[in-house]
């Protein structure tokens, strides 16, 4: 059962939506209002169960209570030359898309899925923006991570498993991929096998691989990109 206070908030949202007063507009950016607190695990679970039924109050609450995630991710892109308020606005579009397309039946947390959508939305904006401006360097240091390593824009964006997998499959078939993998050293091969399940196991996130190997996630991200460049060179030799 929802706690009484949160249940009353939920009912109030339903009333506002029914009256046409509540919309998807976000008033927190640049305003005096504080961001709403994040949902508890129990509250999020209740709202996610209502989402497939088209419950607009649940949808609105899931969006508003995850705005802190948008701000957190947007701040990682502050050194790209885009105004922070614009980044938050763009990231919020990604959050709305995430809530609209989230499938509660899949074994993935909303925060994980939303983070990817928010980052992708900002990345797409950066790419569009680059057509009219000087190119943003994906190897430009943005900050320093917890281990003292430089945090690059490419590290922050992470690596979209689907994009890389489709890119590789579009270039060569699995036979050539496995042949190319044998040109890597043991550590590089292990990282690729863990990340993309190439040895028959499950695909793992960069964080999972970093924890398993005892190194930082940003280092895994950087190393992964170098490995993929090497693989592409091997592909070019074979095709």
Curated annotation (Swiss-Prot):
NCBIfam families noted in UniProt: PRK05803.1, PRK08301.1, sigma70-ECF, spore_sigmaE
Post-translational modification: Proteolytically cleaved in the N-terminus probably by a SpoIIGA homolog to yield the active peptide.
Highest rank taxon of the organism: Bacteria
Protein name as catalogued: RNA polymerase sigma-35 factor
Protein family per UniProt: Belongs to the sigma-70 factor family.
Motif (Polymerase core binding): 86-99
SUPFAM superfamilies: Sigma2 domain of RNA polymerase sigma factors, Sigma3 and sigma4 domains of RNA polymerase sigma factors
Function summary: Sigma factors are initiation factors that promote the attachment of RNA polymerase to specific initiation sites and are then released. This sigma factor directs the transcription of crystal protein genes, a sporulation-regulated event.
InterPro entries: Cro/C1-type_HTH (IPR001387), RNA_pol_sigma-70_dom (IPR014284), RNA_pol_sigma-E (IPR014200), RNA_pol_sigma70 (IPR000943), RNA_pol_sigma70_r2 (IPR007627), RNA_pol_sigma70_r4 (IPR007630), RNA_pol_sigma_r2 (IPR013325), RNA_pol_sigma_r3/r4-like (IPR013324)
Protein's organism: Bacillus thuringiensis subsp. kurstaki
Record propeptide residues: 1-27
Chain residues forming the annotated DNA-binding region: 206-225
Record's keyword terms, sorted: DNA-binding, Sigma factor, Sporulation, Transcription, Transcription regulation
UniProt GO molecular function: DNA binding; sigma factor activity
Record flagged with keyword ATP-binding: no
């Amino acid at each position: 059962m929802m706690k009484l206070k949160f249940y009353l908030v939920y009912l109030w949202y339903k009333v506002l939506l029914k009256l046409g007063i509540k919309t998807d507009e976000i008033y927190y950016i640049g305003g005096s209002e504080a961001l709403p607190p994040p949902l508890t695990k129990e509250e999020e679970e209740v709202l996610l169960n209502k989402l497939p039924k088209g419950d607009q109050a649940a949808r609105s609450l899931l969006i508003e209570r995850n705005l802190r995630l948008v701000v957190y991710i947007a701040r990682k892109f502050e050194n790209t030359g885009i105004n922070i308020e614009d980044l938050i606005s763009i990231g919020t579009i990604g959050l709305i898309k995430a809530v609209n397309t989230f499938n509660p039946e899949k074994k993935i947390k909303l925060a994980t899925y939303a983070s990817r959508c928010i980052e992708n939305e900002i990345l797409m904006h950066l790419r569009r923006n680059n057509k009219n401006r000087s190119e943003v360097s994906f190897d430009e240091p943005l900050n320093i991570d917890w281990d003292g390593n430089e945090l690059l824009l490419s590290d922050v964006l992470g690596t979209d498993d689907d994009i890389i997998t489709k890119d590789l499959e579009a270039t060569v078939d699995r036979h050539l991929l496995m042949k190319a993998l044998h040109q890597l050293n043991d550590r590089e091969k292990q990282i690729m096998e863990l990340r993309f399940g190439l040895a028959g196991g499950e695909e793992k996130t960069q964080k999972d691989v970093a924890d398993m190997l005892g190194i930082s996630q940003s280092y895994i991200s950087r190393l992964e990109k170098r490995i993929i460049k090497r693989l592409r060179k091997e592909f070019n030799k074979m095709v």
